[in-house]
Amino acid sequence: MSYKSGFVSVIGRPNVGKSTLLNTITGQKIAIMSNKPQTTRNTIRGVITNKECQLILIDTPGIHKPKTKLGEYMVNVASETIKEVDLILFLVEANTQPGAQDVNIIQQLKQIKTPVFLILNKVDLISKDKLLAIIDSYSKLMDFKAIIPISALKNDGIDLILKEALDYIPEGPQFFSEDMLTDQPEKVIAAEMIREKVLLNLDDEVPHGVGVEVTSFKEREDGLINIQATIYCEKSSHKGIIIGKQGNMLKKIGSAARYEIERLLDTKIFLELWVKVKPDWRNSDNMLKTLGYKTNKN
């Protein structure tokens, strides 16, 4: 059989486990995770390479009704991505009937010719009878090329996705080297890991208004990497929460982020964090550009 290579998009509404699925398939944490919706803001590409094929999996932001320019950017990224891939994995929760957001995504999928797999995540949380009922509900909405129940967290059903995907991936060369797991620059990964720790440690109101910019990423002669990063928030009160009493929260965020970045880069780092207030930055084209989000004006 000839070698195959292609692009696979993982889409779905916010917080259904898209980043968990990407991390499980690649066997490495390359996408940040939290239980808060809209954690993923950019497309993140994970690379899987074996003797038969190379698959480039694209984790997209959750499709939702946007309230800011950042939200509009996230939805546009997800919507445009599905037009440029060889296969789409539509990820839903196995224990939930199709909702308005799911139906909206399906309407978009029906307008393109790209094959779509229905992937039902969190199958370990539901009985077989209820699962079959939910599968039936989705089957009435669209003709999926494959329907695969999985548990991304427990690595259950993942091999079946890869096996079935081969039938829809074209012949082609390797786009990336065999040892490459993601095309994300190290600077971007570092910023995302810092943002993840903010998401995990703070209340719901603050994280949605937080962006992270790595302002310096330099390797020293002794092999240590110096990283300087700024955490942007929209309110002075949020700045105080992020820093915490006597700086304890910022220290906690920095310590957790440093551990994660060191594990990913396989080297020691020195991490410095600052917190700055930028009111309404999620609606600022200049700030979105600074943080790496492409808008219609850049």
Swiss-Prot record:
Era-type G domain location: 4-171
Membrane topology, as annotated: Peripheral membrane protein
Region span, G4: 121-124
Record bears the keyword Protein biosynthesis: no
Pfam families (alphabetical): KH_2 (PF07650), MMR_HSR1 (PF01926)
KH type-2 domain ranges (all copies): 202-279
Region spans: G5: 150-152
Residues noted as binding GTP in the record, renumbered to the chain: 12-19, 59-63, 121-124
One GO process term, biological-process aspect: ribosomal small subunit assembly
Molecular function, one GO term: GTPase activity
Chain segments carrying region G3: 59-62
Cellular component terms (Gene Ontology): cytosol; plasma membrane
The keyword Plastid belongs to this UniProt entry's keyword annotation: no
Superkingdom field: Bacteria
Keywords per UniProt: Cell membrane, Cytoplasm, GTP-binding, Membrane, Nucleotide-binding, Ribosome biogenesis, RNA-binding, rRNA-binding
Entry function: An essential GTPase that binds both GDP and GTP, with rapid nucleotide exchange. Plays a role in 16S rRNA processing and 30S ribosomal subunit biogenesis and possibly also in cell cycle regulation and energy metabolism.
NCBIfam families in alphabetical order: era, PRK00089.1, small_GTP
Name of this chain's protein: GTPase Era
Lineage of source species: Bacteria, Bacillati, Bacillota, Clostridia, Eubacteriales
